[in-house]
Structures are given as structure tokens and as C-alpha cells.
Design a protein with these regions (language model features):
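Conserved anion-binding
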Residues: 1-79, 97
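C-terminal helical cap(s) of enzyme catalytic domains, especially alpha/beta-barrels
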Residues: 114-125, 136-176
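Surface-exposed amphipathic alpha-helices with a cationic face
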Residues: 14-18, 62-69, 88-95, 152, ...
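Glycine-rich loops and low-complexity Gly/Arg-rich segments
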Residues: 24-27, 49-52, 101-103, 125-128, ...
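Amphipathic, non-transmembrane alpha-helical secondary structure
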Residues: 7, 11-15, 55-59, 109, ...
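Short C-terminal domain-edge/linker segments immediately following a structured domain
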Residues: 5, 30-33, 107-109, 130-135, ...
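Generic alpha-helical propensity signal that fires on short helical segments
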Residues: 17, 40-44, 94, 118, ...
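A C-terminal functional module that forms or caps the active site or interfaces directly
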Residues: 76, 80-129, 133-137
Length: 176
């Protein structure tokens, strides 16, 4: 979902999904370069004044996940290609308790080192999408299988390493 009118504008849709045992993903920091100026813009008013738009989206999504045992059902889209933008955005994926959908690996240029940078300290909640990367190895079934196995191993190892990293970002308790 795209929160162009503010993350709270999605509240009705999010509540409908949650009330029906479903979940949603909200774009926060995407792999699309065109979105960077909007996502990293500093909010001029409202609850998250002085923070980035992406931070406000992530914080609002996290509020829907509070009180859940285990992983929440409101997720974020955080692109694997954003690299060091993650530091400038104020968004800390390691503090997020919902699923994180991460496009951009392979086909759009993200590599394992990018996963380790962006998802440092996460706790097994990152879903890396690789469909275009794998499809590029087709139509040969053996090549598709080999690409799938190879990329799965690479991503698994990168996310394990990211999970073991300690993030330097510390948020105030009320911001978590």
C-alpha cells in the first residue's frame, strides 16, 4: 500500500485486513530511486515533525503491531538497494516487529552486502523477493533450479550475518 496521504489514511484498510485475519505491506523505503526524495523528506508538521516521511510510516506501522505475540501483521516494504539511506531515514528495521518485504536483490542490483547493511540486527522477519532475478535464468529448468538454490543460500547467509550485527541506532522508548 502507498501512504501518499499519510500512513494514518490507511487505517481503515489496515483495520479491515487485521479484523479478517490478514496482513498488509506499506511502502516505507522502496528500491525505486524516484521515491527517495519523498521517502527521505523531512516532515514539517504532525506527530513525526522533523523526522523523515519513511520514519513516520514505519512508526505508524509499528503501532499496529504493538501487543502482538510474535510477528505483527502490518509489514513494511524496504528495498534492498537503499544502502546507507537507511541511516539517513531514521528507520531502524531491527526495531520493527512486523514482516519486511525487500525487493531489489539481484535484478535491481542489490547484493548480499546490501542486505547486511540495510537489515542489520533484524530478527528473521525479512522476506527478500528474487523472482525477476531467478526468472532471468530460464527457461531451462536446471538453470532455474541452480539459480534458486544459489540465491537462497546467499540470502540466508547474509540475513543470518545481518541478524548477528548490533545496530548503533538507539531510539527513545516512546519512539519504538
Amino acid at each position: 500500500m502507498l501512504p501518499y496521504y499519510g500512513a494514518r489514511s490507511l487505517g481503515g484498510v489496515i483495520n479491515d485486513a487485521l479484523n479478517n485475519g490478514r496482513g498488509v505491506f506499506i511502502a516505507s523505503l522502496t528500491s525505486n530511486q524516484e521515491g527517495a526524495s519523498l521517502q527521505t523528506a523531512i516532515r514539517q508538521a504532525g506527530e513525526y515533525k522533523g523526522r523523515t516521511v519513511a520514519y513516520g510510516i514505519a512508526s505508524t506501522a509499528q503501532k499496529f503491531n504493538k501487543g502482538n505475540d510474535g510477528m505483527g501483521s502490518v509489514g513494511l516494504i524496504i528495498g534492498a538497494t537503499i544502502g546507507q539511506w537507511i541511516n539517513d531515514s531514521g528507520v531502524d528495521p531491527s526495531k520493527f516487529t512486523g514482516p519486511i518485504l525487500s525487493p531489489g536483490y539481484g535484478w535491481q542490483g542489490a547484493e548480499t552486502r546490501d542486505l547486511k547493511t540495510v537489515f542489520k540486527g533484524t530478527k528473521g522477519n525479512v522476506l527478500v523477493t528474487v523472482s525477476r532475478f531467478i526468472a532471468a535464468h530460464g527457461p531451462d529448468i536446471a538453470a532455474l533450479s541452480a539459480a534458486t538454490e544459489s540465491v537462497a543460500l546467499d540470502i540466508r547467509q547474509a540475513l543470518i550475518e545481518a541478524q548477528n550485527e548490533i545496530d548503533d541506532v538507539v531510539l527513545d522508548d516512546e519512539e519504538e
